[in-house]
């Protein structure tokens, strides 16, 4: 699979909800700015932050498992955590049934890639959702398929 432009396009065109692990309530941080920008362009965000509270107007879940227990299917999991934590997040994403894992710009993990790809997840690393959206001219979310996989993708 890998993080080719085709995979990036499949993710950006196939999902309209982003579960953001490491989402921040601080508008000065990329972990707030990027998902907030995606939200303004029509994507729904599900923040995951161990502090809970409200982030970008949405209730933050403390873990991916807590989000899943609250009825939030992970689908696309966007990661704003250090590279050293990415494999743990990948395992959690697989455990809750995610179908795509995106490691933001600066986050690289061969272990996370192996975990995700072995489980059949689409995988991207070291790229920014917002930058890629603009670069590829995709100003709207996917075709309203919610948190599920892209058309024709089983998982």
PLM ranges: what are they?
Residues 24-29, 35-56:
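NAD(P)-binding Rossmann-fold cofactor-contacting core
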Residues 1-14:
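Short N-terminal or domain-adjacent regulatory/targeting segments
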Residues 85-104:
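Rossmann-fold NAD(P) dinucleotide-binding segment
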Residues 18-19:
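Conserved beta-strand elements of the Class I
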Residues 1-4, 54-87:
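Glycine-rich, highly charged phosphate/nucleotide-binding loops
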Residues 105-133:
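Rossmann-fold NAD(P)-binding glycine/threonine-rich loop
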Residues 132-155:
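A charged, well-structured terminal subsegment
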């Amino acid at each position: 699979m890998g993080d080719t432009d085709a995979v990036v396009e499949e993710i950006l065109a196939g999902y309209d909800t982003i579960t953001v692990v490491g989402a921040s309530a601080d508008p000065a941080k990329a972990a707030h700015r990027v998902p907030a920008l995606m939200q303004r362009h029509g994507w729904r965000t599900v923040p995951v932050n161990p502090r809970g509270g409200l982030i970008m107007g949405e209730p933050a879940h403390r873990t991916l498992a807590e989000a899943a227990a609250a009825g939030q299917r992970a689908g696309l999991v966007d990661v704003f955590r250090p590279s050293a934590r990415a494999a743990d997040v990948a395992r959690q994403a697989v455990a809750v049934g995610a179908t795509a894992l995106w490691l933001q710009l600066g986050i690289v993990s061969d272990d996370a890639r192996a975990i995700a790809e072995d489980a059949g997840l689409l995988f991207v690393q070291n790229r920014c959702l917002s930058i890629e959206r603009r670069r590829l001219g995709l100003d709207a979310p996917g075709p309203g398929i919610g948190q599920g996989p892209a058309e024709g993708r089983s998982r």
